[in-house]
Curated annotation (Swiss-Prot):
Function as written in the Swiss-Prot or TrEMBL entry: Catalyzes the reversible transfer of the terminal phosphate group between ATP and AMP. Plays an important role in cellular energy homeostasis and in adenine nucleotide metabolism.
Cellular location(s): Cytoplasm
Pfam families (UniProt xref): ADK, ADK_lid
Primary enzyme class: transferase
Record text on subunit structure and interactions: Monomer.
Binding site for AMP: 31, 36, 57-59, 85-88, 92, 156, 167
Name of this chain's protein: Adenylate kinase
Domain description: Consists of three domains, a large central CORE domain and two small peripheral domains, NMPbind and LID, which undergo movements during catalysis. The LID domain closes over the site of phosphoryl transfer upon ATP binding. Assembling and dissambling the active center during each catalytic cycle provides an effective means to prevent ATP hydrolysis.
Lineage, broadest ranks: Bacteria, Pseudomonadati, Pseudomonadota, Gammaproteobacteria, Pasteurellales
Region (LID): 122-159
Length: 214
């Protein structure tokens, strides 16, 4: 099963990705991890990517797709894979298609912006341990304090409302057009497209996913 996950940051993709990986025994492929691994291993593609990144330049789509193709040719992807964070744009989706990679299923996690802002801006973190809380969904016993150590909790920069809104703006501009792209691909019979309501409780979304995935 070759799957693409679509959805804004904070839409719950990460949680459900774990569920799919455990159910099917397929790896999650993140382009960030791939670049880091290729650079660390010193592969030819890794060297090219590093040279561009060191100059502060964006890695071109052809190079990213070449890395993806390299990665999905590895033995652990024999039964499929889960692409998260790629493709991000229509040119990347076209490049993936042109390179002959067939996607079986595209999953969209649909969550309204205001819900995402509430979800992410309510997160609190105990930095030394990495323990996370949420002021609404998973509050600490004492407001602003870690349950175990009693130390202060912080709001990460990424979770501040203004940062969340910036990330959402980029998502809507760059990635949302992919929803129309893959809906059209599904109508043409090239893939399957399923939309999930990401505002439902995690267990309900997982149960829906289990049905979709059969």
């Amino acid at each position: 099963m070759k799957i693409i996950l679509l959805g804004a940051p904070g839409a719950g993709k990460g949680t459900q990705a774990q569920f799919i990986m455990n159910k099917f025994g397929i790896p999650q492929i993140s382009t960030g991890d791939m670049f880091r691994a290729a650079i660390k291993e010193g592969t030819e593609l890794g060297k090219q990517a590093k040279a561009l990144m060191d100059e502060g330049k964006l890695v071109p789509d052809e190079l990213t797709v070449a890395l993806v193709k390299d990665r999905i040719a590895q033995p652990d992807c024999a039964n499929g894979f889960l692409l998260d964070g790629f493709p991000r744009t229509i040119p990347q989706a076209d490049a993936l298609k042109d390179s002959g990679v067939k996607i079986d299923l595209v999953l969209e996690f649909d969550v309204a912006d205001e819900v995402i802002v509430e979800r992410m801006s309510g997160r609190r973190v105990h930095q030394p341990s990495g323990r996370t809380y949420h002021v609404v969904y998973n509050p600490p016993k004492v407001e602003g304090k870690d349950d175990v150590t009693g130390e202060d909790l912080i709001i990460r920069q990424d979770d501040k409302p203004e940062t969340v809104l910036e990330r959402l703006a980029i998502y809507h501009k760059q990635t949302k057009p992919l929803i129309a792209y893959y809906t059209a691909e599904a109508e043409a019979g090239n893939t399957r497209y399923e939309r999930l309501d990401g505002t439902k409780p995690v267990e309900e979304v997982s149960a829906e996913l289990a049905k979709i995935l059969g």
